[in-house]
C-alpha cells in the first residue's frame, strides 16, 4: 500500500547560519518525491528532512513511499511524483516506458547483491565451482541479484541450465535457506545481514566480484525536468549534500539511519547498519561529474547500464531498452557545478 507523508524538517539556528542561502528560499515550492522504505539508497531523502535541508533549498517535500520499484515507476506515468530514487532495473524500465531520466547515482549496490552459501560449503565450492552442477539456487528472478547470478556463473564457467534455479521472493529465500533448502541463496541488503548473522551464511560471489555493477538511480520525469530544471537541481544538490554529510558524520548518520529503517518496519543490528555504509560506495558531486563524463566516449555509468540493459532485454523485462545515453544525463550535475550556491550546498560546505 502506498504510504505518504509530508516532511520539510526543522531548522536549527546554527544550520541556518552555516548553510549557504538558497535562491528564492523564502517561498517554498511543492516537490513530489518518491522513494522506498528502509533502503540505504533512499536515506539522503529522509536525512534531508531531519536536517531541514529541503526548506533551505526552498522545497516543500511531499514524499511518497512505494513497496518496490515497478509500482514506483508506474506511478510516474500518472504524474504521481516528480523526482525520486529507485533501483537500476526499475530505472531502465521507467526510461523505456515512462520517459524517466537518470540524473545521478545514489549508491553502488554491487557489494550487497550477493550469492551466499553456508560457511561449511564455501571452501569446497570455491575450489571446485563445478560442484554446483545440478544444485538448487534460490533466487528472485529477473532482478539485480539474478543479473549478478548470471555474471557469477560466467566466472564459474557454468551455464544457468547447469543449475536448478528456484524463483522465490526474498523473504521466502531466507525462510527456505534457514531450513536447509538450496545450496546457494541470492540475496540483497538488508537480507544479506540476516543470512550472515542468523544462518551463518557467507558471500560466495557478489556483483562487485563478477564485474556486474548494480547502481541505484536518482531519477526525474522528463517533462518535469524540462519545465523545472532549477527545482530538479535543488533536489539533486540536496541529495548530494546528504551523501557528503554521511561520509563526514558517520555516527550521527547511523543514528538517523536507524530511525529511517524503523519507520519502514526494518530492524537490523548495529553491525549491519555499519555494513550498510561500508558496503555501499557513494559518489559526491565531483565523482559524479567524472563518472558521467562522455567527453571521450561512453561514460563509466553508460557502461554500467549497458550490461544491465542487455540482461533485462534477455529475460524479457524490458524489450529493446534505450541506449544509456538516451536516459542518463549529466545536465543537472553541470547546472549545480556552475552555480556557486548549489555547488557549495551539494558539497556540504
Annotate each language-model stretch with its function:
Residues 228-319:
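Secondary-structure end/capping motifs
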Residues 26-169, 176, 183-189, 204-206, ...:
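Short, glycine-/small- and polar/acidic-enriched structural segments
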Residues 7-18:
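Bacterial N-terminal signal peptides
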Residues 1-7:
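N-terminal export leaders
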Residues 305-349:
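Conserved C-terminal helix/tail region of periplasmic/extracytoplasmic solute-binding proteins
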Residues 66-70, 85, 139, 143-144, ...:
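Soluble non-cytosolic domains of exported or imported proteins
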Residues 19-25:
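Sec/Tat signal peptide C-region and signal peptidase I cleavage site
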